Swiss-Prot record:
EC numbers for this chain: 4.2.3.4
GO cellular component, one term: cytoplasm
UniProt-recorded name of the protein: 3-dehydroquinate synthase
GO biological process, one term: aromatic amino acid family biosynthetic process
Cofactors (names): Co(2+); Zn(2+); NAD(+)
Binding site for Zn(2+): 182, 245, 262
Cofactor remark from the record: Binds 1 divalent metal cation per subunit. Can use either Co(2+) or Zn(2+).
Keyword terms of this UniProt record: Amino-acid biosynthesis, Aromatic amino acid biosynthesis, Cobalt, Cytoplasm, Lyase, Metal-binding, NAD, Nucleotide-binding, Zinc
Main location: cytoplasm
Pfam families: DHQ_synthase, DHQS_C
Source species, domain of life: Bacteria
Listed SUPFAM superfamilies: Dehydroquinate synthase-like
NCBIfam families: aroB
Length: 359
C-alpha cells in the first residue's frame, strides 16, 4: 500500500492506494469519529462491495442508501434520497457518510455531507478508475442542473480516500477507458514524462496490468494533490484540471447524460482543446496526432457521437462555471505537458474547431 497526503492544514487527509484495502477494517474505521455511519452507493456497486464494507462497520450504527446508477441521476431529487435516509434514521452531526462508488456517488455524498446539519464528515471509497484518479480527490462536490453540469455544489474535503485497486476488476471496459481519459489529461497538463510513460505502456494498461495501474493512479493523484494544495477553491491554478471539460460538459449536456460517459466526453473535449492549441500556433500537427493516437489506443472516442449544431454548442458553452464576465476561459496547451488558462483566443479559430466537431 502507498499513502499520499493532501496537506490543507486542518482539512488535511490521507489517500490510501493498494490492493485488498476493503479488508483493512482499521484503515477505514480510524477515520470515523462518531457512532453513526451512512453508506451511500448505487445499484451497480451495492451487490459487489456493500456487504464487504458493512462487515467493517459492525461496531457502528450504520444504514445505507442505494441510488440508481448513472450521471442522469445526479440531481436534486436523488440527493433528497440521501437526506431522507439521514433524517429517517435520526443521524446527528457526529455521523459519517461513506461514498462507495464512482464519481456520481462521490459528488452527491460529498454534497450531502457538506449540507446536512451544515456539515458532517464523509469518506471516499472510489470504485471506478475515473473517480480514483480524479473526482474523489480535492473536495469538489455537487449535482447537475438541467441547464448545466456541476453548477450546484460546494467544496467539502473528505476525511480520507481509500482506493482499493481490486475494485477495478469488476469495472467494464467502457468505464475503464473513460477513466483513462482523466489519466491522459494529467499527462497533457504538466507531466510530459508521464505522457511518454502512457504512450509506452498503453497496451499493458488496457490489459489492466496491476502494477502499472497502481502507478498511474498514484501519479495522477500526486499531480492533482500538487495543484489542489496551491489552489483549493479553484480561483487560479486549479482551473488547469478542467482541460477538455468546457467542451466535454457541453457534449454531455446537449446529448443527454448517458449517451457519452463523462470520460468519453472529456476525451473529445481534450482533442478539441488540442486542435485549438494547434490552430493558435502552440502545438504541431504531429503533437495533435500523438494525442489522438493515445486516445484511440485507450479505446476513447475522438469525435462526437450524435448530432449537435455549432450554434447550440456555443450557446451551452456560455453556461459554464469557468465563464467570467461573459468570457469563456479555455484550458489550452503551449506544449504537451504545459497547460495554461487562455482568456484571449481568436473567436474564428474556436468556431472553426466547434464546426469541425459538430458536422
Amino acid at each position: 500500500m502507498k499513502t499520499l497526503n493532501l496537506d490543507l492544514q486542518e482539512k488535511s487527509y490521507p489517500i490510501y492506494i493498494g490492493q485488498d484495502l476493503l479488508s483493512e477494517g482499521k484503515l477505514l474505521t480510524k477515520h470515523i469519529s462518531g457512532k453513526q455511519v451512512m453508506i451511500v452507493t448505487n445499484t451497480t456497486v451495492a451487490p459487489l462491495y456493500l456487504e464487504k464494507v458493512q462487515n467493517l462497520l459492525l461496531s457502528f450504527e450504520f444504514a445505507q442508501v442505494i441510488l440508481p446508477d448513472g450521471e442522469k441521476y445526479k440531481t436534486l431529487d436523488t440527493l433528497n434520497c440521501i437526506f431522507n435516509a439521514l433524517l429517517k434514521n435520526r443521524f446527528d452531526r457526529s455521523c459519517t457518510l461513506i461514498a462507495l462508488g464512482g464519481g456520481v456517488v462521490g459528488d452527491m455524498t460529498g454534497f450531502a455531507a457538506a449540507s446536512y446539519q451544515r456539515g458532517v464528515n464523509f469518506i471516499q471509497i472510489p470504485t471506478t478508475l475515473l473517480s480514483q484518479v480524479d473526482s474523489s480527490v480535492g473536495g469538489k462536490t455537487g449535482i447537475n442542473h438541467v441547464l448545466g453540469k456541476n453548477m450546484i455544489g460546494i467544496f467539502h474535503q473528505p476525511k480520507c480516500v481509500l482506493i482499493d485497486i481490486d475494485t477495478l476488476d469488476t469495472l467494464n471496459n467502457q468505464q475503464y477507458s473513460a477513466g483513462m481519459a482523466e489519466v491522459i489529461k494529467y499527462g497533457l497538463l504538466g507531466h510530459l514524462n508521464f505522457f511518454n510513460f502512457l504512450q509506452e505502456n498503453i497496451r499493458d494498461l488496457m490489459d489492466r496490468n496491476k502494477p502499472l495501474m497502481a502507478e498511474i493512479i498514484y501519479q495522477s493523484c500526486q499531480y492533482k494533490i500538487n495543484i489542489v494544495v496551491q489552489d483549493e477553491l479553484e480561483v487560479g491554478k486549479r482551473a488547469l484540471l478542467n482541460l477538455g471539460h468546457t467542451f466535454g460538459h457541453v457534449i454531455e449536456n446537449i446529448l443527454g447524460y448517458g449517451i457519452f460517459l463523462h470520460g468519453e466526453a472529456i476525451s473529445v473535449g481534450m482533442l478539441m482543446a488540442v486542435k485549438l492549441s494547434h490552430l493558435e500556433g502552440y502545438l504541431s500537427i504531429n503533437q495533435v496526432a500523438q494525442v489522438q493516437d493515445l486516445l484511440e489506443k485507450a479505446n476513447l472516442p475522438i469525435f462526437i457521437i450524435g448530432k449537435i449544431s455549432a450554434s447550440d454548442f456555443m450557446k451551452v458553452m456560455l453556461v459554464d462555471k469557468k465563464v467570467i464576465n461573459g468570457n469563456i476561459r479555455l484550458i489550452l496547451l503551449k506544449e504537451l505537458g504545459h497547460a495554461f488558462v487562455c482568456n484571449h483566443y481568436k473567436d474564428q479559430l474556436l468556431n472553426q474547431v466547434i464546426n469541425e466537431f459538430c458536422q
